[in-house]
Amino acid sequence: MPMIPYSGGSSLEANFAAPYGGMSIDFAYMDQIVALHEDDMDVVVQPSLQWMHLNDKIKETGLFFPVDPGPSAKIGGMVGTSCSGTNAVRYGTMKEWVVNLTVVLADGTVIKTKKIPRKSSAGYNLTGLFVGSEGTLGIVTEITLKLAVIPQETTVAVVTFPTIRDAASAAAQIMRIGVPVGAMEIMDEVQMNVVNRAGTTGKTWKEMPTMFFKFSGTKAGVQDNISVVRSITKAHCGGDFDFAKDAREAKVLWSARKEALWSMLSLKEEGQEVWSTDVAVPLSRLPDIIEISKKEMDDLGLFASILGHVGDGNFHESVLYDNTNPKERAAVEKCLHDMVDRALEMDGTCTVRSRASPTHKLQANRYRENTGLGWARRSPF
C-alpha cells in the first residue's frame, strides 16, 4: 500500500495527490525546531515547520534560511519537491541547503544520510538522492538545514518595459554580465492588472511588463549593482526605477510579486479554474520562448498571465478558464502543453519549482527519453 507523507498540502501542482490510493501520513504536529547551532550556521527541524516561521524564530541570531517558495510551504514538502523561490538566482534551490536527513525506509530502517560537516567524499550522496524524491524512497522525519547570514543591506526596485521581450532580454544580459542580484522576477501587463484588481498591495501599479529586483549585500556593493542594472534596463527600453526608500516601501514593492498567484485566484468565479504551470530554458532562449508563449496565450482570448524567476530561465503561465466548457479547457490544455513542448525543444525542462505534476505526464515521458529519468525508474534505489 502506498504511504504518502503530508506536511502542508500547499503544492500548486498537486504533488501530494494519491492517484492510486494509499495511506496518508500526516506530520501536522511535527513542526518544531529540534536544535539550532548558531556557530555552525545550521538548524535541525521537523517536516511540518513553515519556512517563514523558521526565519521568524531565528532572526535575532542574524541568520536566515534563504529558500523562499510560497509563504505556506513547509520544510518537509520543500525537501520532497526540491523547491525554490524568488531567491534562487542568488542562493540556489533547496538541494543546496539540505545538510542531512533522517529517513524511515520502506522496511522500517531509520537512516541518517550524512554527518553534519558541509564537505564529505565518503560514499554516495544520499542526501541529494532523497531531496526531490517526493517520498518515494523513504519518509523524511528530520532535516538539517544550512543557514545564511542576513545581508547588511537589502533594497527593492521595480522597472517597467514596453514589451515582455524587452524585459526578458534585459534579464538575460544582467545574468550574462554576472551582476549578483538577490532576486529578479518578471510579470506581464495582465498580471499587473490582476494585482491592481485584487487591491491587496496598497499601491496602484502601471499595467505594463514589469521586473522586480532585490539587491542585497554591503551598502557599497548594493549601490554598484543597482548602477549596472539600471544601465542595462535602460538599454532595453526600461522606464524609471522605482526604489524602496525604507523597509516598509520594500515590502510594498515586493508584495506585488508575492501576491501574484493569490491575486489571480481571487478573481475566480463559479465554474472557473486557474491552470498554472512552469518551464525553464537556457537563458539565451528565454526572450524567444516568453515572446512566443505570450502571443499564443493572448490568442486564447482568456485571462492569462506570465510571471517568473527569469534569473534562472524559469517562468510560469497561468490561465483563468471555464472548467465547464470542454472546448475552452481543451484550448487551454493545448496552449500550455505547446509551451512545455517548446521548452523541451529548446533543451529546457518541463517543470522547475514544483516537480512533475499530473498535468506534466506526457511531457515528462518525452523528457525522460533523453535524460537519466528512465534509468531512475529502473534503478535499484
Which residues fall in each region the model found?
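Glycine-rich N-terminal segment of FAD-binding domains in flavoprotein oxidoreductases
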Residues: 1-30, 47, 309-310, 343, ...
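Short, ordered loop/turn segments at secondary-structure junctions
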Residues: 7-10, 70, 116, 186-189, ...
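Short, acidic (Asp/Glu-rich) active-site segment that either coordinates a divalent metal cofactor
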Residues: 12-16, 23-27, 136-144, 219-229, ...
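FAD-binding subdomain of flavoenzyme oxidoreductases
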Residues: 32-185
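Short beta-alpha connecting loops at secondary-structure transitions
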Residues: 38-41, 157, 274, 324-327, ...
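Activity-critical C-terminal alpha-helical subdomain
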Residues: 109, 356-381
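C-terminal substrate-recognition/cap domain of FAD-linked oxidoreductases
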Residues: 149, 158-160, 168-338, 342, ...
